[in-house]
Amino acid sequence: MGSKQVSKTRNGGFSKLKTVESSASSTTSSSKLYQEASVDSHSSPTSSSVRSKPQLPPKPLQSKENVTVTVRFRPLSPREIRKGEEIAWYADGETIVRNENNQSIAYAYDRVFGPTTTTRNVYDVAAQHVVNGAMAGVNGTIFAYGVTSSGKTHTMHGNQRSPGIIPLAVKDAFSIIQETPRREFLLRVSYFEIYNEVVNDLLNPAGQNLRIREDEQGTYIEGIKEEVVLSPAHVLSLIAAGEEHRHIGSTSFNLLSSRSHTMFTLTIESSPLGDNNEGGAVHLSQLNLIDLAGSESSKAETSGLRRKEGSYINKSLLTLGTVISKLTDRRASHVPYRDSKLTRLLESSLSGHGRVSLICTVTPASSNSEETHNTLKFAHRAKHIEIQAAQNKIIDEKSLIKKYQYEIRQLKEELEQLKQGIKPVSQLKDISGDDIDIVLLKQKLEEEEDAKAALLSRIQRLTKLILVSNKTPQTSRFSYRADPRRRHSFGEEELAYLPHKRRDLTDDENLELYVSREGTPEIIDDAFIEEKKTRKHGLLNWLKIKKKDSSLGGSSLSDKSSAVKSNSTPSTPQGEGSDFHTESRLSEGSALADQIIETMENREAHEDSFHEIETPETRIKMIDQMEILREQQKTLSEEMAQQSRSFKLLSEEAAKAPQNEEIKAEIINLNGDIKAKNDQIATLGKQILDFVIASHDELDKSDIVQAVSEMRAQLNEKCFELEVKAADNRIIQEQLTEKTSFCEDLQEEVANLKQQLSDALELGDINSVTCHMQQSSQSPNKNEEKVIEAQAFEIEELKLKAAELSELNEQLEIRNKKLAEESSYAKELASAAAIELKALSEEIARLMNHNERLAADLAAVQKSSVTTPQGKTGNLRNGRRESVSKRKEQENSLMELKRELTVSKEREVSFEAALIEKIQREAELQRTVEESKQREAYLENELANMWGLVAKLRSQGAANSGLSDSVSETRIEHFGT
């Protein structure tokens, strides 16, 4: 699907994001969806990555099913009612759409919704099962299809009174998270549009003309931005922000018509909490909610940009119809997915292993009967597409280890059951005296022994796999891998600041199974394991919404989100004084790791082997002590991070007010605190080193290597964090230097202005200055100072007023453009009305001429009947009857002509009234344009006057400066005399 958007960063078993793009915890990479794969029990799990593991066809949830197709009728619009539109299509029951004019034309669908159906009912039938499947790991796609102004955007987005499919789906997703305590979820969203065959990112205005890429896993958009979401309100705010960048325009059918296809993708990642029956598999799915642009009818008289947009929309929708026709035709060898970007992104949905729901919105009006029929035929073809839903599961090395451990427990339980089943068999053997029964019991006993041996061998083989998989990731933890990993939105360095991040994940796996020196597996105390699991929090557990405290849930989530934002961004400034502390911590961390390794090597060189075997109690005690030291070190690190953030704020305040001594004192105190924290961290490191050296005799060699490798990993992570902070400190130092230089420049400029002001104050009256030079130098003229200050204030006011006038001028220009467009539209309507009026006048003239001819014929007939002699009429009675019948027919035709003439005159009067109304509206628009032009000219004159006044004041200032020069020369001459 289109949301498999990746910027091709692949780091090992599953694709993992290592950088955060912005402080909003957004990402520009996305994951690949892998189907559940079976792993051979004879292969080592350490060598099985997602691509190297054998890929089998996904196990379907059920048999093949068809695309869910529903039809929704919208009510007649007021415009259609005014025009007298009739119902051409209607819902015949809950599943059939029938034509009003031809009852034999009917189509059957999964559900048909009438005009009075609410969007909530549509969601319950057409979308809810797709959303539930997506939360369970099955890909889902819901899209609305129909002609323009048929109600697609209303169905998908809705309004405050009637929410659409997208808000309802988001709300249901978070409700499912709240109702699923055994799994933890991570949700990411992306939102983009296809406008004129160009993919634009709606969440990132800079992401324009993005490219569609393909690899072995499918189609994705390169560089698309994803946002990690924490609540329904967060998702809806992102949708609202994206809608502001969507292309919308007015057409003859709709004032606000969508001019692009939009696709909202919700990526759902979930993992189990604690033990589960699936071996710790991670579900990764995508829910795509698509709002297609409406197809443009040939009746729409568009031009320019609207015509171009309509051609691109029709092309993509025509390609979509062709693709659906090919998919329903089993003889088709080629499906043209690549003919448009819409079908290219929908390829995995229409031909993959996910659920698809199509909502067709139609209008029952007779004027759109043909377009409605085409939409119904499209929906009927889509109904025959077969799909097969399947869960997307990802199993990494840790999940495989948990799966093997679960299998070992099951096999041991089976072994215990077999042992319990053998005892009654031996008792029956002693009791029975029949030889046949003895033979049968012996055979059964041999079979049980063989099964027991097979189970023991399988347990040993799985134990070896666990040992290998536990050791191998430690050695390759810092090495680069080329295989793709499952994508996470939070890296290890980002999760370090989350409130429940623990480092006992590997300890829990190591405690799960203890293997003695003889190779016999021993399970550690279950009570201790349960205690460890209750203290452990999942990487995604912080995202869950608690039922009891729903009112505080949003605030807590937002606080956690802000914590992630402030700590995960690589470019977060930390202040100027912590750079040397960062470098010292780096050196101390690397030195501590090297010292531990050297100590181990020296001790291993002198000792050949350990004489004591480690017990589970000793291991538990050592792990607890190490965990306490690590928690102390983690607490100090968090306190130091908080102090670094405080240092950042103080640095910003110092940049704004460099003369504030209190801020400088606080910065110095913070530097001292940070240095003290560094010393405490170094002390803890030494304590950990002493603890490792003291407990070296009690630990096994493999455990020491593992502990040191874990400590080295932690130190390397801390070093990486400190490197990031050092870079941030350098950046903030440069910013602070720039601010300081800028403040110095401002101070110099203020000094120059003060000097000019003092010179202007000394000017005043030349005669008084020459007579009282010493007195004027000691006490400056306050009145002149007030005048200059008033002039400066007036200049500032004039500048502000000029800026306001310029903004008002721009607004008036925009308004003039809109009025000009409306005027052109009114002119077009007036011209069309004039053409129609001309045609009507010609028709009226023709009817009048015809009426005159008929009147002349009638007069001639009447005259001939009057002048006819009585004798002749008496002899031709039959002819008289015929003439009377003809006369009646002529009178009837005359009455019909009179009625037609009356109707035509009434139509002429109505058209004349409409024309007069159009002319009046055009005159009003022209008057409005003239008034706006006059106001624009007036504002331009005012602006010119303002600029002239500013120039005049500047010239006065220059004259005052020249006068000050002359006064200074006079002063020199006066002192010389």
UniProtKB/Swiss-Prot annotation:
One cellular-component annotation, GO: chloroplast
Annotated segments matching region Disordered: 1-66, 549-589, 864-891, 958-977
Residue span, Kinesin motor domain: 66-385
Record's keyword annotation contains Transit peptide: yes
A molecular function (GO) term: microtubule motor activity
Cellular localisation: Plastid, Chloroplast
Record flagged with keyword ATP-binding: yes
SMART domains from the UniProt entry: KISc
Residues that, per the record, bind ATP: G146, V147, T148, S149, S150, G151, K152, T153
Skewed-composition ranges (Polar residues): 1-12, 563-575, 864-876, 958-967
Ranges of compositional bias, category Basic and acidic residues: 879-891, 968-977
Compositional bias (Low complexity): 22-31, 38-54, 551-561
Protein's GO biological process: microtubule-based movement
Pfam families according to UniProt: Kinesin
Keywords, ordered alphabetically: ATP-binding, Chloroplast, Coiled coil, Microtubule, Motor protein, Nucleotide-binding, Plastid, Transit peptide
Chain coiled-coil ranges: 386-471, 626-688, 732-942
Family classification: Belongs to the TRAFAC class myosin-kinesin ATPase superfamily. Kinesin family. KIN-7 subfamily.
Record protein name field: Kinesin-like protein KIN-7L, chloroplastic
Organism expressing this protein natively: Arabidopsis thaliana (Mouse-ear cress)
